[in-house]
């Protein structure tokens, strides 16, 4: 079973997160940030991951710590669930449309953390969510998931659609990359023999 359970407590957030990479897209999300709940719900659905997240964060300050720390915890969960990464496809990419928006994402589950985030979100907020926090989420995730992630906005003018599109695109990309390749089910997908 490729599952993980993360408990991450700091002075700023208390996070409980469960992940099943081979799920059906079920989720139970309660972060205290409505827009982030929506993004994580659709991430689970489009990636076919089962995901439970609760967070008690210092949202009276702002949503920065909650958003970044959940990204960190989700990255930790992916690393734990993947183990030594035996048999995974490793790579994935998706070009995903959402109305006027078009998002490209590509991943290499390489063991090397790198984020290239190229999105031009036209407003500072979607509801009460600071749009710059989307990049903070992916930065935290990428660091702890130990993977290379490229997210590029190819088109789009609606801030909600752009962020929504990134979460859906990355979810589908990760779904493909973590899939087991039956032809190499017992092998590490690297000439080095380790990822």
Predicted regions and their residues:
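N-terminal intrinsically disordered, cationic/polar leader segments
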Residues: 1-195
């Amino acid at each position: 079973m490729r599952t993980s359970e993360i408990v991450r407590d700091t002075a700023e957030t208390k996070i409980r997160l469960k992940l099943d990479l081979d799920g059906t897209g079920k989720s139970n999300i309660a972060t205290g940030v409505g827009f982030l709940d929506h993004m994580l719900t659709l991430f689970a659905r489009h990636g076919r991951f089962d995901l439970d997240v609760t967070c008690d964060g210092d949202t009276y300050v702002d949503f920065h710590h909650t958003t970044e720390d959940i990204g960190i915890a989700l990255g930790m969960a992916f690393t734990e669930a993947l183990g030594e990464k035996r048999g995974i496809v490793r790579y994935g990419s998706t070009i995903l449309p959402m109305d006027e928006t078009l998002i490209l994402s590509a991943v290499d589950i390489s063991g090397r953390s790198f984020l290239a985030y190229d999105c031009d979100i036209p407003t500072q907020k979607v509801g009460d969510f600071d749009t710059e926090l989307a990049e903070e989420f992916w930065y935290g995730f990428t660091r702890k998931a130990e993977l290379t992630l490229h997210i590029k906005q190819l088109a789009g003018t609606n801030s909600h659609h752009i962020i929504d599109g990134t979460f859906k695109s990355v979810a589908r990309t990760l779904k493909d990359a973590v899939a087991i390749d039956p032809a190499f089910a017992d092998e590490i997908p690297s000439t080095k023999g380790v990822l």
